[in-house]
Each structure stands twice: as structure tokens, then as C-alpha cells.
């Protein structure tokens, strides 16, 4: 599937460069204006959180209480650190560990540490277990996202790819009675991914926090208790993918890129989490 996805991305890049959508050159500036007037963006600035996504995690935890009693929390794709801040405030003692390809500026929280690296790298995974003193995580959470292309079909597949990657990693690093929180889009692969989650976990919930933008296709899947007889999707852990995804992070923005919450197609616009 990845070879197909990689080809699709390359074709889309060429189409966008040769035929940019009408008005697309203004999309980033429009998004920035809307973002800066948005309630949770301004609230994060006032309250000292690094991103508006902090409030999504707060709202999810208010509902599910996954931080209650947690001592080891792993945040995948943790930059810029908004989820690390919330987790660090929410657990007593223990350790919150964030992993990202980019270096995360110091949060000055005693129970929060970070690792620069790719969590799919076995050496990084061993480093995580070492930091957790040989124990697995009580909570694994992933708000991972790549710069969007502005092309729904491509962005949907890329986001599901990240979610499946997080699921594979969670299988190795989460305690059997632990929690997983992961972001997905309500797109073509959404239902298939939910089936995969249910094959992995005994309890699976689909939630859209109030802090998510109204026009966003994103939802969060919250799951608890790994099944003893679980099955996981195809492992997406090849060395080639490590390199190609790292390279994608360094690409020059395309017209319409960096719009993480554009409106979804109409068939998904009225769809509610189930």
C-alpha cells in the first residue's frame, strides 16, 4: 500500500505545481487569519500552552480519565509539546516521554522528557523502555500529523498511515491494561481502521472534542485494554519508509499546504462519530 501512496503523493505534487488551484496562493494567509481569531488558539496563548491541541487532550481526559493513576505516558510525534504539557500536569510523579523527529524546546517540567528520533527505530524503542525503567507505558497517545497537501484523498491516506504506524508501535510499548489515543480523519479508510482498532483493543471509542475545529474531518480514537489474541495491521516499519517520511517533513510548502483543518468533502461533513 505504501508504494501506491508514495506514487499518489508524487503525482499530486506534480499536478499542484503545474496546475495550482484557483485562489490557492491565498489559502495559507486565510487560514492564519482564521486561526489567530479562533477561541482555543487565543486561549492557549493566554494560558501558556504551546498549541490549541492541548485543549483537545484535556477534554478527552475529562471524559475518559486515562491519566488517572498513570505513571508512564508516551507521546508520539510530540512537537511542539502541547500534549506533553497537559500530560505532565495531569499525572502525579512518573514520567511523560515525548518522541519526535524535531527537537522540542524545553518545557521546564520535572516529569517531562523528550527524545529526538523516529519511534519506528528499534533503538529508539529500546531507549523508551530504558527511560521507563523496563516497564511499558500506561498511556500511548498520538496527535501525529504531516503537512497536508490540500488534496483530500491523499491527506486521508497519509493520516491513516500514521495512525496505523502508531497502532503497530503501541502493540509493542503499551501495557495490556493501558490506554491509546490517536487522531484520524473520517475518510475512506476510517471504518477499516476502526475495525483494526477493535481487533487490537477490548474497548474502542470515537470522539470529536469541542476544541476540534468545526469544519475539521479529524476525530480521536480512544481505546483501552489490549486483547490477548489481538491482531495488528501490516507492520509499516521498513528502513525505506523511515527515510522517505523524514524527507517529507523537509519539503517546501505547496500551494494550499499547511491547512491542517480544511473542510472535508460533503459526504463526510455531516458524518458524526459513531
Locate the predicted segments by residue.
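Conserved SAM-binding loop of SAM-dependent methyltransferases across substrates and taxa
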Residues: 80-91
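Conserved SAM-binding motif I beta-strand of class I
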Residues: 95-100
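Conserved class I S-adenosyl-L-methionine
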Residues: 70-79
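SAM/dcSAM-binding transferase cores
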Residues: 28-43, 51, 62-64, 214-274
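Glycine-rich helix-loop-beta junction characteristic of Rossmann-like nucleotide cofactor-binding loops
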Residues: 62-68, 172
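Conserved S-adenosyl-L-methionine
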Residues: 202-212
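Mobile active-site "lid"/loop adjacent to the S-adenosyl-L-methionine
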Residues: 117-119, 132-181, 188-192
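S-adenosyl-L-methionine
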Residues: 104-134
Amino acid at each position: 500500500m505504501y508504494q501506491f501512496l508514495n506514487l499518489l503523493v508524487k503525482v499530486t505534487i506534480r499536478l499542484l505545481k503545474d496546475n495550482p488551484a484557483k485562489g490557492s496562493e491565498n489559502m495559507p494567509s486565510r487560514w492564519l487569519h482564521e486561526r489567530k481569531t479562533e477561541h482555543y488558539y487565543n486561549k492557549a496563548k493566554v494560558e501558556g500552552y504551546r498549541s490549541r491541541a492541548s485543549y483537545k487532550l484535556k477534554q478527552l481526559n475529562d471524559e475518559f480519565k486515562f491519566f488517572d493513576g498513570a505513571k508512564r505516558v508516551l507521546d508520539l510525534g510530540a512537537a511542539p509539546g502541547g500534549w506533553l504539557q497537559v500530560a505532565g500536569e495531569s499525572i502525579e510523579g512518573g514520567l511523560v516521554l515525548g518522541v519526535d523527529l524535531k527537537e522540542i524546546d524545553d518545557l521546564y517540567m520535572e516529569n517531562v522528557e523528550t527524545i529526538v528520533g523516529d519511534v519506528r527505530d528499534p533503538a529508539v524503542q529500546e531507549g523508551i523502555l530504558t527511560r521507563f525503567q523496563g516497564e511499558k507505558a500506561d498511556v500511548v497517545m498520538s496527535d501525529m500529523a504531516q503537512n497536508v497537501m490540500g488534496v483530500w484523498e491523499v491527506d486521508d491516506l497519509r493520516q491513516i498511515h500514521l495512525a496505523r504506524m502508531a497502532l503497530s508501535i503501541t502493540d509493542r510499548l503499551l501495557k495490556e491494561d493501558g490506554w491509546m489515543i490517536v487522531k484520524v480523519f473520517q475518510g475512506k479508510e476510517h471504518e477499516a481502521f476502526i475495525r483494526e482498532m477493535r481487533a487490537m483493543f477490548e474497548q474502542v471509542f470515537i470522539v470529536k472534542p469541542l476544541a476540534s475545529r468545526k469544519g475539521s474531518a479529524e476525530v480521536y480514537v480512544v481505546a483501552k485494554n489490549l486483547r490477548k489474541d489481538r491482531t495488528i495491521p501490516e507492520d509499516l516499519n521498513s528502513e525505506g519508509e523511515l527515510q522517505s517520511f523524514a524527507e517529507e517533513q523537509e519539503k517546501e510548502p505547496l500551494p494550499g499546504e499547511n491547512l491542517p483543518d480544511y473542510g472535508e468533502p460533503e459526504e463526510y461533513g455531516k458524518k458524526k462519530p459513531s
